[in-house]
Regions:
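Secondary-structure junction/capping motif
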Residues: 2-3, 88, 114
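A generic structural micro-environment signature
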Residues: 7-10, 86, 95, 199
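Protein-protein interaction and targeting regions used for scaffolding, dimerization, and localization
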Residues: 1-16
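Extended, structured, electrostatic nucleic-acid-contact surfaces
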Residues: 73-85
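Terminal substrate-recognition subdomain of acyl/acetyltransferases
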Residues: 17-30, 36-65, 69-73, 102-200
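Conserved acetyl-CoA-binding loop-helix of GNAT-fold acetyltransferases
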Residues: 83-100
């Protein structure tokens, strides 16, 4: 019986849109907006009379190999290169970008992350049961002997590697949302946007 409940829960999570993301879709639609997918970025537009292609949020990414992410990074498809939002719709752009990886996942920029972007990653780690979190290792194999999960971990500050920044507890960095790979098993956000005619 527990397995059946777990299975049903998993189906519901992969088929449903997070309520906060749904409210962002509603807001974008109310303002005549839409999402456009490019080979290297997702941009949310809210047109105005004077500016028909007025953008309000953007997440740009590169392949893990193209970004020289420093390892296989758990098989991640892409790494965020930059993100910006003029409104509170940034997380919607992130969700679309994660879904575009086809279940392979996305990681944060490996060199620097703004406080706004960190808040998005923290939210994914702590509040999004529909998003799969996978712990990454550093390039010195601190957590596992396997190489597939190795990924640069220098994003926790500017004093060397993440492990160097916690000399008394080298495993402390694993609590960081930036040391994870994030992926989704379905595309409910893109499906909802497509259903509303808001995905280009």
């Amino acid at each position: 019986m527990n397995l059946l409940r777990e299975y049903i829960r998993e189906i519901l999570l992969t088929e449903s849109v997070d309520p906060k993301i749904m409210s962002m879709i509603d807001e974008l639609e109310k303002n005549g907006g839409y999402a456009e997918v490019f080979p290297d970025r997702v941009i949310l537009f809210q047109p105005t009379e004077n500016t028909p292609r007025r953008w309000v949020a953007m997440v740009a990414y590169d392949t893990v190999v193209g970004a020289h992410a420093g390892g296989r990074c758990g098989g991640a498809e892409s790494v965020v290169q930059s993100a910006t939002a003029k409104t509170g719709l940034g997380p919607l752009a992130y969700d679309i970008a994660i879904e575009l990886t086809g279940g392979l996942g996305m990681i944060s920029d490996r060199a620097s992350v703004s406080s706004d972007a960190r808040a998005v990653w923290d939210y994914y780690m702590n509040n999004r049961p529909d998003v799969i979190k996978q712990q990454l290792d550093n390039t010195n194999d601190l957590l596992t002997p396997e190489k597939d999960d190795n990924c640069e971990q220098e994003i926790e500050g500017t004093g060397g590697t993440a492990v160097d920044m916690f000399p008394d507890n080298p495993r402390a960095w694993i609590k960081s949302s930036l040391s994870k790979l994030y992926k989704k098993s379905g595309t409910p956000v893109m499906d909802e946007l497509r259903k509303r005619g808001m995905l280009r």
